[in-house]
């Protein structure tokens, strides 16, 4: 059986990869994927702690986090399509003004 520490370590590694992806990359699509990786790593930690304590609270919270993440992806992709149509790029450095 895999210990809770292994799950937490994996979650921390995935979260760190997500933070590095958001800070280093300039492509909006990669930044969205990195944010999703960070949310999923938090979900993994919640599930691990929920499993260790034999309670279902972490699983319930994870379900709501997944629902909010789905809404975030829908809004984010709509914004991305709008920005791409206006600027013809997905590079975040090229989109520095609010003017169309």
Curated annotation (Swiss-Prot):
Extract the Pfam families matched here. Oxidored_q2 (PF00420)
Molecular function per GO = NADH:ubiquinone reductase (non-electrogenic) activity; quinone binding
List the catalysed reactions.
Answer: a quinone + NADH + 5 H(+)(in) = a quinol + NAD(+) + 4 H(+)(out)
Query: Any keyword Transferase?
Result: no
- Where is the chain membrane-spanning? 4-24, 29-49, 60-80
Going by the UniProt record, its keywords in alphabetical order are:
Cell membrane, Membrane, NAD, Quinone, Translocase, Transmembrane, Transmembrane helix, Transport, Ubiquinone
From the Swiss-Prot or TrEMBL record, state where the protein is found.
Answer: Cell membrane
Membrane topology (UniProt):
Multi-pass membrane protein
Which GO BP terms, alphabetically? ATP synthesis coupled electron transport
Task: List, alphabetically, the InterPro entries matched.
Answer: NADH_UbQ_OxRdtase_chain4L/K, NUOK/Mnh_C1-like
Which Gene Ontology cellular component terms are annotated?
NADH dehydrogenase complex; plasma membrane
| Similarity annotation | Belongs to the complex I subunit 4L family.
Q: What does this protein do?
A: NDH-1 shuttles electrons from NADH, via FMN and iron-sulfur (Fe-S) centers, to quinones in the respiratory chain. The immediate electron acceptor for the enzyme in this species is believed to be ubiquinone. Couples the redox reaction to proton translocation (for every two electrons transferred, four hydrogen ions are translocated across the cytoplasmic membrane), and thus conserves the redox energy in a proton gradient.
Quaternary organization: NDH-1 is composed of 14 different subunits. Subunits NuoA, H, J, K, L, M, N constitute the membrane sector of the complex.
Name under which the protein is recorded:
NADH-quinone oxidoreductase subunit K
Protein's organism = Herpetosiphon aurantiacus (strain ATCC 23779 / DSM 785 / 114-95)
